[in-house]
Each structure stands twice: as structure tokens, then as C-alpha cells.
Amino acid sequence: MSDRVKITPMTLNFGPQHPAAHGVMRLVLEMGGEVIERIDPHIGLLHRGTEKLIEYKTYLQALPYFDRLDYVSPMCQEHAYSLCVEKLLKCEIPIRAKYLRVIFCELTRILNHLLNISSQALDIGAMTPLLWMFEEREKILGFYERASGARFHSAYIRPGGVAADVPDDLIDDIFKFIKTFPKFIDDVDELLTENRIWKQRNVDIGIVSKEQALDWGFSGPMLRACGIPWDLRKSQPYEIYEDLEFEIPIGKKGDCYDRYLVRMAEIRQSIKLLEQCLNRLPNGPIKTDDRKIAPPKRSEMKESMEALIHHFKLYSEGYSVPIGETYMAVEAPKGEFGVYIVSDGTNKPYRCRIRAPGFAHLQAIDMMAKGHMLADLTAIIGSLDIVFGEIDR
């Protein structure tokens, strides 16, 4: 009689209520013992019909929907939408507004990567980074609140500029924060990067080759971890990125460990970008002077009838956008976040298509996890950096 144990294939449901699923994700796993043979992701549990809802809102009213897509890094999505509308309007925004946008987008990148690295570590069993990193995230959310009045859904970056100017003491506090923050990142680096257990759980897990990454439509840290130095801030510069100096961190193998290293390096590059922006931040207006697009100041409305009419018309009817269609993408923390708008010349978008980076990454999970152990699946999901607000839309 053979000593070999006959393993019967088993179907396993992972999620939709599971702490390592990073939201409402259901995976149907076909297991051969403890080895994954096939993964079938079921998405759509957080579908809210965002793209359709936008068609019934004015261009300004549609903005808050973008905060609620990838709710971990909201400002980058507002940015993509605002750039898209501005392109259709052929609207130029003041240089100070461009600097403020880049400052908050880079703070958002740090915010996103802190959450991803800490939750990836927690999924694998390291609890300390989560407690450390959430303390730093709170500081950045405090900057959000002081600039816009909201910690998460800020609606700060708007077509025509930014919602409001930042107080001088906020700029000073961000500067103080980025002076002490690199020391904190060094501590996290020391805690995780060469940690034996961390490396055992991440090295050679979920390997993706350059060819596979391009075939699946990867972008952001997922693509750069495979060794492809593609970053929209360099390849298709927008705002003031072409005037700033920074490097594109890339990986070698394209495994979970490389994805972690790329995100850690990106945090350091964001600090470098923030330092340059804060040192160069010019004075001046923060909105376009076209009162059909950006509202007038409150003080103007008390004296000028035209300003009051502009304000009323902007917040009741909105502005009409010329007929046309355009696509605009930004380098969001998770990858290429794109917005495609078709305008029919009215005050509402005829069609708004959203390109979420997480969707392309999640569809490749079967290819990444096949042949791995069930325990490795949490490491792979953690390294994907998925948020279901943007995937399900």
C-alpha cells in the first residue's frame, strides 16, 4: 500500500468578510491541499454606479465622487478629474495653485504607502509597523483638515485651482514634518527590510515578469517593481513635475518584497519633492480669474453685483464645457489613475469613464498566486494595494 495521501481538490471561499481581503472582496479558491490551483475573484460588492451618477451632476458637483473612489488617497483622484475638465475648458491655473496641488498629491502618496506597508505587515503578522505608521498618518490627515476642513473627503483640488489658500503656519508645520519624517522611515526600514521573517514571507512570492506586467496593464509601483521605470510624472509631466528633481525607484524581480521596497523608496522621493515645492512655493492667486469657473471672494460678493451673480450661477447651474472629449491621467499612489470625459456642450458630462489602477492589478491575482500556499495569498493581496472604492466604482 502506498504511503502517499490522496489529496482531494477543495473549493474555498476567501471573503467577502475577511480582514486580509482589504475590503469587500470574494475570492473563490480551488485548492490542491494547501496549494492554490486557481483563483476566481468576485468583485462588484461595493459598486455604486459612480460613472452613471456623474452624468446627472454639474462638473463641480461631480468632484466629491472622486474622493470616494480610492478613499485612502483621495486628492490624487480629484487632481485627475480637475486636470481633465481644465483641458476641455482650456483653462490655465495660477502657479501657486500648481505648487499646492503637487504638495498635497505628494502628501497623499505618503499617506497611501504608509497604510499599504503597515497593513501588508499586519496581514503577515507584524503588528508594530501599523501602530507606528498610523501615528504619522494622523499628522498628514491633520494637514488635510487644516487646508480643506475635512480629514478624508477634502474636495480641495477643484477645476480652476484649489478650494482655498493654506495658512502660513501650515506650510511651516509641513516643513517641520518632512524634516523629522525621514528618521521615522529609517526606523521602519530597520524594523522590516532585513527582518528574516519578513523576507521569508515576501521574497519570491507573487513574481511578475516585465512582459506579464505590460500584458496585464500594470502601472505604478506594481509595474516599477518589475524593473520598468515608467512614471507619468516623468514620461508625461503635468503641473510642475518637469521642473522638479526626483528619481524613479525600480525593483528587479517583481515579487512582493520588491513592491514593498519600491513603495518605501517612493516615500523618500515624495519627501524630496515636498522639500523642493515648499522652498519654491510662490505667492499669488490660487484660482483662475475666470469667474465663470472659479467663485469670487466673499468680500467681493458684498460689494459687487456681478460677483454675486457669478457665485449664484456657478453653484446653481454650473458652467458649460465646450463640446469635445479628452483623457487625462495622473500618477496616483496605486498607479495610473485616468479620467476620460465626453462633453456635449452642456453643464453636465455626457460620459465620464474612470480608469482605476487597482482593477488591472486584481485581475492578475490568479497568475500571481497560482502554485503558492494559501498563507502566501495574504502577502500577495497586501502587496497589490487594492481598494474596492476604485475597483468597483
Curated annotation (Swiss-Prot):
Alphabetically ordered keywords of this record: Cell inner membrane, Cell membrane, Membrane, NAD, Quinone, Translocase, Transport, Ubiquinone
SUPFAM superfamilies according to UniProt: HydB/Nqo4-like
Membrane topology label: Peripheral membrane protein
Principal location: membrane
EC number: 7.1.1.-
Cellular component, GO, one term: plasma membrane
Cell compartment(s), UniProt: Cell inner membrane
InterPro entries: NADH_Q_OxRdtase_suD, NADH_UbQ_OxRdtase_49kDa_CS, NDH1_su_D/H, NiFe-Hase_large
GO terms for MF: NAD binding; NADH:ubiquinone reductase (non-electrogenic) activity; quinone binding
Pfam families assigned: Complex1_49kDa (PF00346)
Catalysis performed (reactions): a quinone + NADH + 5 H(+)(in) = a quinol + NAD(+) + 4 H(+)(out)
UniProt similarity note: Belongs to the complex I 49 kDa subunit family.
Cited function: NDH-1 shuttles electrons from NADH, via FMN and iron-sulfur (Fe-S) centers, to quinones in the respiratory chain. The immediate electron acceptor for the enzyme in this species is believed to be ubiquinone. Couples the redox reaction to proton translocation (for every two electrons transferred, four hydrogen ions are translocated across the cytoplasmic membrane), and thus conserves the redox energy in a proton gradient.
Quaternary structure, from the entry: NDH-1 is composed of 14 different subunits. Subunits NuoB, C, D, E, F, and G constitute the peripheral sector of the complex.
Protein name per the record: NADH-quinone oxidoreductase subunit D
Species per Swiss-Prot/TrEMBL record: Ehrlichia chaffeensis (strain ATCC CRL-10679 / Arkansas)
